[in-house]
């Protein structure tokens, strides 16, 4: 159900995007909503998965079928919920996660929020041999020149996105200082830089 949603990308938030189609705005939870920033106000196709809970029906969206499949594999693991799976995919490509699983790299997996040693081991036990490494994932970025005011906004929005993924304000304090020393061409780029810092 809801294999994908195709329509105009109207809004970006730290945890989700809104896609309007046939007069209806669909709220879609994504690993890194700012990945779609360059498509704002344009038509997009987002691969989706609907998860029904007792208190809500949530639509999760991804930039590729590979990312969606990795998400669906991760949430089958005991101890991994949608939020943890999104946090993993916000930082890593599907192939990077698959390599960590195949190489039994528990240390890599414990870098993500909410993933302890026990859960990392469970991911490996449940998914090793079941995930296939595909051709390299591609994620293009729109390169634009940004003003200093835009730079501040990029960093602020990146911090909100990182906090939404489950990282604490204490963990992010040093990250924010480092981000402010550099220049970024988009929120997505700042988020990726922040994610690399927080898991390093």
Curated annotation (Swiss-Prot):
Keywords, sorted A to Z: Cytoplasm, DNA damage, DNA recombination, DNA repair, DNA-binding
Protein name, entry field: Holliday junction branch migration complex subunit RuvA
Family: Belongs to the RuvA family.
Superkingdom, natural source: Bacteria
GO biological process: DNA recombination; DNA repair
A UniProt-annotated Pfam family: HHH_5
UniProt-annotated stretches for the region Flexible linker: 143-149
Domain II: annotated segments: 64-142
